[in-house]
Amino acid sequence: VLNRVIDFMLSYSQSNLNPEEIVLKEIFEEILNDYSHIFDQENIKVDSSFPVQLKLTINKQFFRDILQNLIDNSIKAMANAKTKILKVSYEALSNNLVIKVSDTGVGIPVERREQVFALYYTTTQDKGGAGVGLYIVKTRVESLKGTVSIEDSEFGEIGTTVKIVIPFKN
């Protein structure tokens, strides 16, 4: 955890120094591939939807940090779930990139949905959570002029959906 905080602080200080053009589908697939052994080991079914080939000029490491932290959280949240499904998608709406990461984990009660973005707030301490991941997601998304929110789960009564909206120019 300390290493993640230090890495975060170092890369944050370099924030927008290195924006580069990325192909979203490639980044999403690369990150999901990085986790494939964990998905197999934990018996997690991955449902991904990347319907459009979209290029974005953005800090690549910030973008990776966002996705990796959301996936890490989903894996922890599904540790004791009977059905383990991770759904990752993006779409372009107007001049916004809308990313959704959903899981069939324990879920987040409505009254705690704002709290989870605070530094050191965790509901998964017993699974190694330190309350840093969603804080990193929030600060990274905000540095990209975007918003992040917790929505009702796409899976009904179980799980969580995190929605990120990042503006871009066509």
Positions of the model-derived regions?
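Conserved DHp (HisKA) dimerization/phosphotransfer helix of two-component histidine kinases, i.e.
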Residues: V1-I38
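Conserved catalytic submotifs in the C-terminal HATPase_c
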Residues: D40, K45-K55
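Conserved polar catalytic motif of the HATPase_c/GHKL fold
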Residues: Q61, Q68-N73
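Short beta-strand/loop element within the Bergerat-fold HATPase_c
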Residues: T83-N95
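Acidic ATP/Mg2+-coordinating residue in the GHKL
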Residues: D103
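Short conserved segment of the HATPase_c
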Residues: I108-Y120
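Detector for a conserved hydrophobic position within an alpha-helical segment of the HATPase_c
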Residues: V141-E142
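Conserved glycine-rich
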Residues: G146-T147
